[in-house]
């Protein structure tokens, strides 16, 4: 492990301690760099907060154990009200409108880099905040850029595109310079209880329960027909909100007569007729698009790429970058044309743009371009 010179003596950093290995190692690395480190554990969810589904109590216990091991103070804060108003209600509204939202992106925007930063500033007198995200910060020409994490498989810039350079400048991302395996090795060397803790996956407020059961608690299901792209009814669905474009599993329509062995995919959701439209093969023509229109734009530098720029885009997490060209229909509407057709571009999800290793920002996919 590389030794780090303590060059930041006296600067106070509040680390978002989640009870996971990434935030644990972030706190340790910042201590080694000479920062005055304190932890802050966020409780963001209370509805149906039972032992069966919610790991918050265990996560807090692990966060406290790590802070005790490192000899730092751990604060706690309850952002459940802010989370409900700014993240969960958005999540429900998007599903109700037939789109597929990404609540993790909204959580970063409204909670981790807004409510958390404000609390760290006003209550804890922080110079910086820090999170266990796999991204990097680069300060250049008086501003701060956000770069992809070194570990390409764990890079989380897709989830942080709504940050402006002002927030990036106030944030530290120690594990963004490391591979995940290195992070776990550091945690093990330091004897941190989280060194072999499983990474959290899925949507935080759903936990281990079935997504359909959870969603039905808040939005009544509206069953309807499943049709092929040729218009033949071949099954029923329990609600369009349970399905997303490109979905293959859970359709319950295998082994049909007069069809080949290719898997079925969701290729369209007809909201007017409440019909789920499916087609066979991952390259089905109705699954492909030549571009997209994005709105609700956020640019890290607050300006965005120039009109006509050739850059790259991700339309979902861990997707290979897609070369594209971009033009503005207005200040808040961007038209994106892919160099090659892309499958399963999904309205409601985010399109995030890159110039090499620099995350430029992004927007919400509003419409697909198929011509």
Curated annotation (Swiss-Prot):
Disulfide linkages recorded for this protein, renumbered to the chain, are: 107-204
Name of the protein described by the UniProt record: tRNA-specific 2-thiouridylase MnmA
Which stretches does the entry tag as region Interaction with target base in tRNA? 102-104
Provide the binding site for ATP: 16-23, 42, 132
Reported EC number(s) for this entry are 2.8.1.13
CDD domains reported in the protein's UniProt record = MnmA_TRMU-like
Which parts of the sequence are annotated with region: Interaction with tRNA? Answer: 154-156, 316-317
- Biological process terms in GO annotation: tRNA wobble position uridine thiolation
- Site Interaction with tRNA — annotated at 133, 349
Localization recorded for this chain is:
Cytoplasm
Function as written in the Swiss-Prot or TrEMBL entry: Catalyzes the 2-thiolation of uridine at the wobble position (U34) of tRNA, leading to the formation of s(2)U34.
What family does the Swiss-Prot or TrEMBL record give for this protein? Belongs to the MnmA/TRMU family.
Could you tell me the keywords of this UniProt record?
ATP-binding, Cytoplasm, Disulfide bond, Nucleotide-binding, RNA-binding, Transferase, tRNA processing, tRNA-binding
- Provide the reaction this enzyme catalyses: S-sulfanyl-L-cysteinyl-[protein] + uridine(34) in tRNA + AH2 + ATP = 2-thiouridine(34) in tRNA + L-cysteinyl-[protein] + A + AMP + diphosphate + H(+)
> According to its UniProt record, which residues of this chain constitute the active site?
107, 204
InterPro entries according to UniProt: MnmA-like, MnmA-like_C, MnmA-like_central, MnmA-like_central_sf, Rossmann-like_a/b/a_fold
Q: What class of enzyme is it?
A: transferase
> Molecular function terms in GO for this entry?
ATP binding; tRNA binding; tRNA-uridine 2-sulfurtransferase activity
Q: Which GO terms describe its cellular component?
A: cytoplasm
């Amino acid at each position: 492990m590389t030794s780090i010179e303590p060059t930041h003596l006296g600067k106070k950093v509040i680390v978002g301690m989640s009870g996971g290995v990434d935030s644990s190692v972030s706190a340790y690395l910042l201590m080694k760099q000479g920062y005055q480190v304190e932890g802050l554990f966020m409780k963001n969810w209370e509805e149906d907060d039972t032992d069966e589904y919610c790991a918050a109590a265990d996560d807090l216990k692990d966060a406290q154990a790590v802070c005790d091991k490192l000899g730092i103070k751990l604060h706690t804060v309850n952002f459940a009200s802010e989370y409900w108003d700014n993240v969960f209600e958005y999540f429900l509204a998007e599903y109700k409108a037939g789109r597929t939202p990404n609540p993790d992106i909204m959580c970063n925007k409204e909670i981790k880099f807004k409510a958390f930063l404000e609390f760290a500033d006003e209550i804890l007198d922080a110079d910086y905040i820090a999170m266990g995200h796999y991204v990097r910060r680069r300060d250049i020409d008086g501003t701060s850029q956000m770069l992809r994490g070194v570990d390409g498989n764990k890079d989380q810039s897709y989830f942080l595109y709504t940050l402006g350079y002002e927030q990036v400048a106030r944030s530290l991302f120690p594990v963004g310079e490391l591979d995940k395996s290195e992070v776990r090795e550091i945690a093990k060397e330091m004897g941190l209880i989280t060194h072999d803790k499983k990474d959290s996956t899925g949507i935080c407020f759903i936990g281990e329960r079935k997504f359909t059961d959870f969603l039905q608690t808040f939005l009544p299901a509206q069953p309807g027909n499943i049709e092929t792209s040729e218009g033949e009814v071949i099954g029923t669905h329990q609600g369009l909100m349970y399905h997303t474009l490109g979905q293959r599993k859970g359709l319950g329509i295998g082994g049909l007569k007069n069809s080949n062995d290719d898997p079925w995919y969701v290729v369209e959701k007809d909201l007017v007729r409440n019909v789920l439209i499916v087609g066979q093969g991952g390259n089905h023509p109705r699954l492909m698009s030549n571009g997209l229109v994005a709105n609700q734009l956020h640019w890290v530098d607050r300006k965005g790429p120039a009109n006509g720029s050739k850059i790259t885009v991700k339309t979902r997490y861990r997707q290979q970058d897609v070369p594209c060209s971009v033009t503005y229909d207005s200040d808040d509407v961007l038209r994106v044309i892919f160099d090659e057709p892309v499958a399963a571009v999904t309205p409601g999800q985010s399109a995030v743009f890159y110039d090499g290793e620099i995350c430029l920002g992004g927007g919400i996919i509003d419409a697909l371009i198929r011509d």
